[in-house]
Amino acid sequence: MASGMRRTGRELAIKIIYSFDGTGSVEALLATFWSNFRFRDDVLGEPLEDSSQAVAEPVREFAEDLVRGVAENLEKIDGLIGEFSTNWSLERMARVDLAILRMATYELLGHLDVPVSVIINEAVEIGKRYGTKETPSFVNGILDRISRTCRPVVAS
């Protein structure tokens, strides 16, 4: 899948994860999101580029994989984020930042074929678009620490 399509999938996943509170059915959440996606604004109020155009199937599948992966591994993911976010509890974090961190942490754990630098850079870029001015450095710092523990560089 092209990198632009993966970015779109990540952005869609962030929007779904943002509304996930750890309870209820992930499948119901996905169904609700995709049914709302046809409107002119998405769940965060962002205007859709073309609200009449359906999401490409590979993009949708990638987004759903990320969402399901976060939901299935939420306790582990939140544990890692909490462990490596010095002086920040998950409850104090901005919800957008937490959604980005959850998605990227899952990708670090579950998508070993994607380079660490790509995962972190994508999270930072999405943070620039949806978060505050502090989001990119906040997300970068936590994901860097998580990646050093969960995805150490193998010496050759």
UniProtKB/Swiss-Prot annotation:
The lineage of its organism: Bacteria, Pseudomonadati, Thermodesulfobacteriota, Desulfuromonadia, Desulfuromonadales. This is Transcription antitermination protein NusB. Coiled coil: none annotated. It comes from the Bacteria. Signal peptide: none annotated. GO terms for biological process: DNA-templated transcription termination; transcription antitermination. Keywords: RNA-binding, Transcription, Transcription antitermination, Transcription regulation. Pfam families: NusB. Involved in transcription antitermination. Required for transcription of ribosomal RNA (rRNA) genes. Binds specifically to the boxA antiterminator sequence of the ribosomal RNA (rrn) operons. PANTHER family: ANTITERMINATION NUSB DOMAIN-CONTAINING PROTEIN, N UTILIZATION SUBSTANCE PROTEIN B-RELATED.
